[in-house]
């Protein structure tokens, strides 16, 4: 069971950032950008997970979810831009900078998480 006391601070910061953006009206545009960038980066992320699982010898059946989402999430990301981002920016071009800011905030938080996870996992592998 996950506990705050055993969760790396970078993951807590990411979670708190997403919650903070989503629960504060003044950060509506940033929240949309942060959520949108998750959709936009999902296809490559799940593709990389599938490649890693394959490298570890995990069967095609066990990788099916990730293989499916690597393809499906491409259409989701296009739909996110077409149906959410583009109409908002067309209606109010000033929101574009705030949406981009939210996307960058989420990307930086995610990068810090992945860097920490990588460092933690390397330490665990090195001590095996």
Task: For the regions a language model picked out, list residue spans one by one.
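Non-heme di-metal
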Residues: 1-128
């Amino acid at each position: 069971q996950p506990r705050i006391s055993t969760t790396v601070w970078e993951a807590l910061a990411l979670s708190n950032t997403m919650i903070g953006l989503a629960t504060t009206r003044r950060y509506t545009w940033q929240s949309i950008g942060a959520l949108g960038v998750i959709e936009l980066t999902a296809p490559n992320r799940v593709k990389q997970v599938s490649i890693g699982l394959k490298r570890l010898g995990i069967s095609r059946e066990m990788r099916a979810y990730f293989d499916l989402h690597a393809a499906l999430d491409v259409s989701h990301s296009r739909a996110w831009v077409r149906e959410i981002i583009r109409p908002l920016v067309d209606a109010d071009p000033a929101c574009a900078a705030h949406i981009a800011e939210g996307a960058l905030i989420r990307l930086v938080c995610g990068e810090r998480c992945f860097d920490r996870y990588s460092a933690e996992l390397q330490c665990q592998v090195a001590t095996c």
